[in-house]
């Protein structure tokens, strides 16, 4: 399925949650923190007031409660406004 975000929205594939701590303790699914990092997989065309800075392939940081979760063909994504992205990792 092809998803094209509208206006100033971006589609992000969240990074997988950590399975183990640095000390080697396995983290159960119920205790895992929601990932705050992911890869941009699609971007909208922007608005007349906001140019799109993010590009497909950018790795970004976003807030804990940013975006709306959606699942497509078994893969979980987040869709959010570009302004909800805190930083681009380089």
Curated annotation (Swiss-Prot):
CDD domains registered for this protein in UniProt: cpn10
Cellular location(s): Cytoplasm
Gene Ontology terms describing biological process: chaperone cofactor-dependent protein refolding
Coiled-coil region: none
GO molecular function: ATP binding; metal ion binding; protein folding chaperone; protein-folding chaperone binding; unfolded protein binding
InterPro entries hit by this protein: Chaperonin_GroES, Chaperonin_GroES_sf, GroES-like_sf
Top-level taxonomic group: Bacteria
Record's GO cellular component terms: cytoplasm
Residues making up the signal peptide according to the UniProt record: none
Record keywords: Chaperone, Cytoplasm
Pfam families, sorted: Cpn10
Primary subcellular site in the record, as a coarse category: cytoplasm
Entry's family note: Belongs to the GroES chaperonin family.
Record note on quaternary structure: Heptamer of 7 subunits arranged in a ring. Interacts with the chaperonin GroEL.
Function: Together with the chaperonin GroEL, plays an essential role in assisting protein folding. The GroEL-GroES system forms a nano-cage that allows encapsulation of the non-native substrate proteins and provides a physical environment optimized to promote and accelerate protein folding. GroES binds to the apical surface of the GroEL ring, thereby capping the opening of the GroEL channel.
Annotated protein name in UniProt: Co-chaperonin GroES
Species, as recorded: Bacteroides thetaiotaomicron (strain ATCC 29148 / DSM 2079 / JCM 5827 / CCUG 10774 / NCTC 10582 / VPI-5482 / E50)
């Amino acid at each position: 399925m092809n998803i094209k975000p509208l206006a100033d929205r971006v589609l992000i594939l969240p990074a997988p949650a950590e399975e183990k701590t640095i000390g080697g303790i396995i983290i159960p699914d119920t205790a895992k923190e929601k990932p705050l990092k992911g890869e941009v997989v699609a971007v909208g065309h922007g608005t007349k007031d906001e140019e799109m800075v993010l590009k497909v392939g950018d790795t970004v940081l976003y807030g804990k409660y940013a975006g709306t979760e959606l699942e497509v063909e078994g893969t979980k994504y987040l869709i959010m406004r570009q302004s909800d992205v805190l930083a681009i990792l380089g």
